[in-house]
Amino acid sequence: MRITNVIWLPDIVDKLAWKHRVATIEVEHVLAHPTRFKFAELGRHHGEDVYVVFGQTEAGRYLAVWFIYKFNQEALILSAREMDGKERNSYGKK
């Protein structure tokens, strides 16, 4: 999966900062150096589905990032947070 650009909505940036303590630069690093993409659900528009990517930031945090993969290869960020225990264990077994 090739991502050419990341789309940030102001409300999402705010939510990531106050609720999940995740910075935009961390999300962009995970998307630029993905370990595993996983289909999450069908999107509202045909061909624009929701995916989750699991990866590690430069600082060593393990993040799960949800995004809509757009037709033009852009990623519209929906959410991001630290991986939970089950995700972290699965990530370690890649």
What are these regions (language model features)?
Residues M1-K94:
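Ribonuclease/tRNase effector modules and their secretory precursors
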